Swiss-Prot record:
Keywords: Cytoplasm, Nucleus
GO cellular component term of the entry, any: nucleus
Domain of life where this protein originates: Eukaryota
Keyword hit for Cytoplasm: yes
InterPro entries: SSSCA1 (IPR009563), UPF0148_domain (IPR051888)
Keyword Transmembrane: no
Localisation: Cytoplasm; Nucleus
UniProt-recorded name of the protein: Uncharacterized protein C3B8.8
Region (Disordered): 72-98
Length: 153
């Protein structure tokens, strides 16, 4: 029987080779999750090692399926394609949602700047306040222009 660390190491090695760790616990040892490679039969890494050592004939089906599973070639292109397919969709969704959030921020910024612009109008008749108001209006218009150009890019 393998130790807990050895079982964990075996599970990790199988997972690195493309095997799936299932949520089904082995009915024999009642400790280790079952493993499977695509459509092949499930197996327990702990019990397979016990069977190899003891050559138990009562579990021939499990022992026979293990070498077949281990000898199957691992298709790196299929795994790579599958990984690209699963990662592209969330990245695209995140990119689109972050783009929408950015557009929303720019829209709110433009609205706020336009309301500040409205607050500056009508222009004051006093000369010293007129210059300050014109400078602020110019700055607001520049910020609105910048925000709109960022939205379109």
């Amino acid at each position: 029987m393998l130790t807990q660390d050895e079982v964990s190491a075996q599970l990790g090695q199988y997972m690195l080779r493309g095997y799936t760790l299932l949520d089904t616990i082995c009915p024999k040892c009642e400790k280790v999750p079952m493993m499977r490679l695509r459509d092949n039969p499930m197996f327990c890494v702990s019990c397979i090692n016990d069977l190899k050592e003891s050559d138990a004939s009562e579990h021939v089906t499990v022992a026979e399926s293990a070498p077949k599973i281990a000898s199957l070639p691992i298709s790196k292109t299929n795994d790579a394609e599958r990984s690209q397919q699963t990662t592209k969709a969330p990245v695209m969704e995140r990119t689109e949602s972050s783009h929408q959030a950015t557009l929303s921020v720019y829209s709110r910024l433009i609205s706020e700047l336009e309301s500040q612009l409205d607050d500056r109008l009508p222009l004051p008749h006093n000369t010293e306040f007129l210059d300050v108001s014109l400078q602020r209006i110019e700055r607001i218009l520049n910020l609105i222009s910048l925000a709109k150009s960022l939205m379109s890019s």
